[in-house]
Amino acid sequence: MPPIIKRRVMRKIIIASQNPAKVNAVRSAFSTVFPDQEWEFIGVSVPSEVADQPMSDEETKQGALNRVRNAKQRHPGAEYYVGLEAGIEENKTFAWMIVESDQQRGESRSACLMLPPLVLERLRQAKELGDVMDEVFGTENIKQKGGAIGLLTRHHLTRSTVYHQALILALIPFINPEHYPSA
């Protein structure tokens, strides 16, 4: 009798963004938490239905939730859906992470960092943080690279590394399902 060969099933994760920094953070977090799984990571463009630059904690979280909902509607059948939305409140920037499956939801907010006064002043002109950072620091498309985090920490941290940690925290209900009732 021939040996039984177990095929690993590739599990699909839809990331409600095509931003490389966000996609890399999701890839890194899932690979860290579930090292024995094989994943297919698919970044998709879906609306957040909030301002291009959310200016409150509540609006930012709602943007991440909306991204997950819209990704589920447009791309059914994935095992996980991940929405990430960066925002600003007062003088700080942060991001919300929402991870959903059919049975569960996890959420977490990233660490926050203070923004320079000149950046905050220019943000009042209804611009996105990435665009303002490019103007002030003379960079190009920083939001898809290290982000404001990378610039302001002199690359000791990046957008992806900070999001990685927050995504692992959002995965807690999936790591410990016995302690979290299904959504």
Curated annotation (Swiss-Prot):
<keyword id="KW-0378">Hydrolase</keyword>
<dbReference type="InterPro" id="IPR026533">
    <property type="entry name" value="NTPase/PRRC1"/>
</dbReference>
<keyword id="KW-0547">Nucleotide-binding</keyword>
<keyword id="KW-0546">Nucleotide metabolism</keyword>
<dbReference type="GO" id="GO:0000166">
    <property type="term" value="F:nucleotide binding"/>
</dbReference>
<protein>
    <recommendedName>
        <fullName>Inosine/xanthosine triphosphatase</fullName>
        <ecNumber>3.6.1.73</ecNumber>
    </recommendedName>
</protein>
<dbReference type="GO" id="GO:0103023">
    <property type="term" value="F:ITPase activity"/>
</dbReference>
<dbReference type="InterPro" id="IPR029001">
    <property type="entry name" value="ITPase-like_fam"/>
</dbReference>
<dbReference type="GO" id="GO:0046872">
    <property type="term" value="F:metal ion binding"/>
</dbReference>
<comment type="similarity">
    <text>Belongs to the YjjX NTPase family.</text>
</comment>
<dbReference type="InterPro" id="IPR002786">
    <property type="entry name" value="Non_canon_purine_NTPase"/>
</dbReference>
<keyword id="KW-0464">Manganese</keyword>
<comment type="subunit">
    <text>Homodimer.</text>
</comment>
<dbReference type="InterPro" id="IPR050299">
    <property type="entry name" value="YjjX_NTPase"/>
</dbReference>
<keyword id="KW-0479">Metal-binding</keyword>
<keyword id="KW-0460">Magnesium</keyword>
<comment type="function">
    <text>Phosphatase that hydrolyzes non-canonical purine nucleotides such as XTP and ITP to their respective diphosphate derivatives. Probably excludes non-canonical purines from DNA/RNA precursor pool, thus preventing their incorporation into DNA/RNA and avoiding chromosomal lesions.</text>
</comment>
<dbReference type="GO" id="GO:0017111">
    <property type="term" value="F:ribonucleoside triphosphate phosphatase activity"/>
</dbReference>
<dbReference type="GO" id="GO:0009117">
    <property type="term" value="P:nucleotide metabolic process"/>
</dbReference>
<dbReference type="GO" id="GO:0006772">
    <property type="term" value="P:thiamine metabolic process"/>
</dbReference>
<dbReference type="Pfam" id="PF01931">
    <property type="entry name" value="NTPase_I-T"/>
</dbReference>
